[in-house]
Amino acid sequence: MDTLGRKVVVCDNGTGFVKCGYAGSNFPEHIFPALVGRPIIRSTAKVGNIEIKDLMVGDEASELRSMLEVNYPMENGIVRNWDDMKHLWDYTFGPEKLNIDTKNCKILLTEPPMNPTKNREKIVEVMFETYQFSGVYVAIQAVLTLYAQGLLTGVVVDSGDGVTHICPVYEGFSLPHLTRRLDIAGRDITRYLIKLLLLRGYAFNHSADFETVRMIKEKLCYVGYNIEQEQKLALETTVLVESYTLPDGRIIKVGGERFEAPEALFQPHLINVEGVGVAELLFNTIQAADIDTRSEFYKHIVLSGGSTMYPGLPSRLERELKQLYLERVLKGDVEKLSKFKIRIEDPPRRKHMVFLGGAVLADIMKDKDNFWMTRQEYQEKGVRVLEKLGVTVR
């Protein structure tokens, strides 16, 4: 709370999950799927102890997903369906989750780098007009990740459910001209895994199956260090085969798909996306930075977001970066490679890094009036109040 006794809320609206809680806490109070579902047919009023309503949100929508038409209001980190997004916020602030009186609270929200201004304006408008928060701040996700890691300078590789960003931050300011975006993230890997499992003869086609395959992915997928070697193992042995029990009791076997699905992050062409993979994009980003800052960036690469949780991802990233540096900078001179210092930080709680950084920032700033956009300022200036966010949130 601030000195006036107002709660300070932190809400990290991801494409796949909402992480919300309070300033100063070191874990989100609530984490739930960012989905909204509507019953396909109204047959029963209750399933187990969950009442079926015309509109189901979050955890309940996820549990009853086989009976619902489910929608994600956000796609690639950007709100696509504002009506559903409001339902999601009603659920977040209402009795089911935070249960707060929004009029007497401040809120820190997060947004992806390179977020369209229109999107940010609309978020601020909804926060002040619909929920009437007393203060609002919108922070860039990558900067919050570094705060959570106790750094002011570094490169964040943030890969969530909807979008992957590579975002260099220098002395606490994100560098928009160097920020790169890759529209491949958790959701695309899940889709690709569905396709790969289909080739094995398992059909997952209902919108509810998507959640099931996501769970398979989280449990079994990993990033191969040496892709040729993994493929050889998959073809010639059964070492990689694991069984997975589906919600209906059926058991399926998953083998080479375990590393083939996340490989799309490194080789986008596998899912028909043009452009370079995450390792090369990271290399290009750092090489495009000012020559004096490059070595700092190579030494402070921070992973963030659920799609960086694959076992094997940090070591594969390091291997590819060294390879690219050797070929393109050192022109093959192996002798000099030993001088090349690189460090990839993979904090164990990186799934919630953005929230943690937001909780730290909101706590430090809770009483600083010049930090928050206030309801009064919004009433006077409208969306021009965003100018107050200044350069840090470009």
Curated annotation (Swiss-Prot):
Cellular component terms (Gene Ontology): Arp2/3 protein complex; cell cortex; cell projection; cytoplasm; nucleus; site of double-strand break
Database matches in SMART domains: ACTIN (SM00268)
Places the protein is found: Cytoplasm, Cytoskeleton; Cell projection; Nucleus
InterPro entries, A to Z: Actin, Actin/actin-like_CS, ATPase_NBD
UniProt keyword list: Actin-binding, ATP-binding, Cell projection, Cytoplasm, Cytoskeleton, Nucleotide-binding, Nucleus
Origin: domain of life: Eukaryota
PROSITE patterns, per database record: ACTINS_ACT_LIKE (PS01132)
A GO MF label: actin binding
KW Nucleotide-binding (keyword) present: yes
GO biological process assignments: Arp2/3 complex-mediated actin nucleation; positive regulation of double-strand break repair via homologous recombination; positive regulation of transcription by RNA polymerase II
Function in brief: ATP-binding component of the Arp2/3 complex, a multiprotein complex that mediates actin polymerization upon stimulation by nucleation-promoting factor (NPF). The Arp2/3 complex mediates the formation of branched actin networks in the cytoplasm, providing the force for cell motility. Seems to contact the pointed end of the daughter actin filament. In addition to its role in the cytoplasmic cytoskeleton, the Arp2/3 complex also promotes actin polymerization in the nucleus, thereby regulating gene transcription and repair of damaged DNA.
Family listed: Belongs to the actin family. ARP2 subfamily.
Subunit note: Component of the Arp2/3 complex composed of ACTR2/ARP2, ACTR3/ARP3, ARPC1B/p41-ARC, ARPC2/p34-ARC, ARPC3/p21-ARC, ARPC4/p20-ARC and ARPC5/p16-ARC.
Name listed for the protein in its UniProt record: Actin-related protein 2
